[in-house]
Amino acid sequence: MQHETKMENQSWLKKLARRLGPGHIVNLCFIVVLLFSTLLTWREVVVLEDAYISSQRNHLENVANALDKHLQYNVDKLIFLRNGMREALVAPLDFTSLRDAVTEFEQHRDEHAWQIELNRRRTLSVNGVSDALVSEGNLLSRENESLDNEITAALEVGYLLRLAHNSSSMVEQAMYVSRAGFYVSTQPTLFTRNVPTRYYGYVTQPWFIGHSQRENRHRAVRWFTSQPEHASNTEPQVTVSVPVDSNNYWYGVLGMSIPVRTMQQFLRNAIDKNLDGEYQLYDSKLRFLTSSNPDHPTGNIFDPRELALLAQAMEHDTRGGIRMDSRYVSWERLDHFDGVLVRVHTLSEGVRGDFGSISIALTLLWALFTTMLLISWYVIRRMVSNMYVLQSSLQWQAWHDTLTRLYNRGALFEKARPLAKLCQTHQHPFSVIQVDLDHFKAINDRFGHQAGDRVLSHAAGLISSSLRAQDVAGRVGGEEFCVILPGASLTEAAEVAERIRLKLNEKEMLIAKSTTIRISASLGVSSSEETGDYDFEQLQSLADRRLYLAKQAGRNRVFASDNA
């Protein structure tokens, strides 16, 4: 049983090998190599892409941290000022100058505009409007018991604001704006008549209105983008502000205004000059503030669709990246600014960078390897194909007679034995025909060997055309042929032999110019039906004996028995 399984496996492998062929195997091997090389290259591309994304995020994080650090410093100053203001509201300093300031306020509070100054070199002036103007505002009110304390606290904060404000700071203006109709600012109001306009410019700004107890329930620091309160100045500003509360009462707002141009300059200074890419700053509503690119100081390179995609991506995380056409956009929310910093890196910038050089080198290596692989495939495929053709030709020549194109003696015997064994296994008859051309030596002697070769070739063609599909014919001697008929009885084999004899004898063939001859053959037939013997050599010997009986009986005959 194990032997049968082994034979079946070998047979299956042989069939597969015949079906595939060496060329198909070469193709398959090269396809596998190409697929694996492409897979490895793709894996390298994925790793390179991850490294590129990490690099983009690291560059963005460095700039964001630098900007955040500077903004945090200003936020910390604002919190410090609010704490000082709260302390001053609860426990004001008992200075004569401060008491005089309260008295002066009581004297001028009904005036349309007023200013209180203690010492211009030490503190800032308090600028205010009348009770009548305050009463017209919805958010404004002087109905609080600590109004005097707020006046003195504003003067104290003015002293701190003067100390905190310097030319190297990002902050252009720091101010305290009270709901009670006055303000303190590091930008002085030169003329009293300008106080109402400036005050109402403050209290109508989003950074003031947005700190009402309804709008800012958590009383936290907030950032706003707005136009300045001065009509002559059209440059947008970013204002950080915080409400001032004490005993659950909202007194006013402390704020610091930072011009966008200042943030733009700081953004440029924070960027490594050797790095490509554009940095853009947006507020919480994705409104463009500034850019590090001098060519787009007030531009926006994103269309509405791209801004919508960016906003959708920002909903799920505080940092990330997204591809937009040929650009890679990375973004990170700032900790101390209600906005987001965006880095835009274009394809051309990426190609010029280190990752671009590596990508180009990787692509060229893959292309070179693939080209060499294809050339190798073509050369080896041609070599294998030529060798296969040569092998097939040599194998054919080893198994066939080149003149008659029939099997030679060795090949015929190799074919006959397994066919005889198969017929014996299935109890089918197995027959053999021996054919010998009559007077062939005379043809050679009279017309030459070339004519003899033509006769042999002509006879082989007629014999082949007379056989069944499963029959096998071969040349076993000079003018002798042998035909194997698996599954044919003695009678059927005799009929085939007679058909061969008639075809050979009926057709004339041209030997030389104006010379034709007619050939004949003597045939002997044997079959396993007679003795039950399936030995091919025995059957061939028996058929050969009957062939010579046919020659002795006068040639051009078929003998299927020793008596006929």
From Swiss-Prot:
Subcellular locations according to the entry: Cell inner membrane
Residue span(s) of domain GGDEF: 428-563
InterPro entries xref list: CHASE7, Diguanylate_Cyclase, GGDEF_dom, Nucleotide_cyclase, Rev_trsase/Diguanyl_cyclase
Catalytically driven reaction(s): 2 GTP = 3',3'-c-di-GMP + 2 diphosphate
Membrane topology: Multi-pass membrane protein
Single Gene Ontology MF annotation: diguanylate cyclase activity
Pathway: Glycan metabolism; bacterial cellulose biosynthesis; Purine metabolism; 3',5'-cyclic di-GMP biosynthesis
GO cellular component: plasma membrane
UniProt main location, coarse: membrane
EC number: 2.7.7.65
Record-marked site positions (Transition state stabilizer): K441
Cofactor note: Binds 1 Mg(2+) ion per monomer.
Gene3D superfamilies given in the database record: 3.30.70.270
Sequence intervals crossing the membrane: 20-40, 360-380
Top-level taxon of origin: Bacteria
Gene Ontology BP term (one): cell adhesion involved in single-species biofilm formation
Protein purpose: Catalyzes the synthesis of cyclic-di-GMP (c-di-GMP) via the condensation of 2 GTP molecules. Cyclic-di-GMP is a second messenger which controls cell surface-associated traits in bacteria. Involved in the regulation of cellulose production.
Assembly and binders: Homodimer.
PANTHER family for this protein: DIGUANYLATE CYCLASE DGCQ-RELATED, REGULATORY COMPONENTS OF SENSORY TRANSDUCTION SYSTEM
Stated name of the protein: Probable diguanylate cyclase DgcQ
Provenance organism: Escherichia coli O157:H7
